[in-house]
């Protein structure tokens, strides 16, 4: 075997090794991502099943995992008649709350209200849930210093209920 053939052979083995290492890394990454998202997906599946048991929900457009004093799973979607509804399911599955979306402020409106009230903060997301027995949007913002803030906005009127700052 000539020197050139030996170099070619080493190069081939190097490429095979590199491909195998990359393949193992990709499979590992996909496995970790799947396992980390599984609790969220399972909560969505269970909340959807409970919501369909208590309502005529046929289509789910959004899912929220909300935790304040208690944990709630909220679904936005449409019923059999095409009405836009929100279904809020407590973690224990009891006392499901059903809201007509038209009777309250939307996620976007809640986020816009917070952005207007706190122009120096960056609005990140909103989640629907229950706080002190009333439906609320929990709007998450960040300050210039990177601190996280939570603003609770009433679903009914879009008014600020509470702000938790600098977490």
Predicted regions and their residues:
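Conserved histidines in hydrophobic membrane contexts and catalytic metal-binding motifs
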Residues: 51, 66-94, 108-167
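Acidic/histidine-rich, surface-exposed loop or edge segments in extracytoplasmic proteins
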Residues: 27-30, 89-97
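N-terminal membrane topogenic signal
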Residues: 9-11
């Amino acid at each position: 075997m000539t020197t050139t053939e030996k170099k070619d052979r080493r190069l081939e083995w190097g490429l095979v090794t590199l491909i195998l290492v990359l393949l193992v890394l990709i499979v590992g990454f996909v496995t970790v991502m799947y396992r980390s998202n599984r609790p969220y997906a399972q909560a969505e599946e269970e909340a959807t099943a409970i919501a369909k048991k208590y309502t005529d929900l046929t289509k789910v457009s959004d899912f929220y995992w909300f935790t304040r004093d208690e944990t709630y799973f909220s679904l936005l979607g449409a019923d059999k008649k095409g009405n836009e509804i929100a279904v809020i399911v407590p973690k224990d599955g009891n006392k499901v709350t059903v809201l007509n979306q038209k009777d309250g402020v939307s996620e976007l409106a809640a986020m816009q209200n917070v952005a207007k009230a706190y122009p120096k903060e960056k609005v990140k997301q909103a989640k629907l849930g229950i706080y002190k027995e009333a439906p609320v949007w929990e709007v998450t913002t960040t300050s210039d210093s990177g601190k996280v803030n939570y603003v609770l906005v009433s679903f009914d009127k879009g008014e600020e209920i509470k702000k938790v700052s600098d977490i």
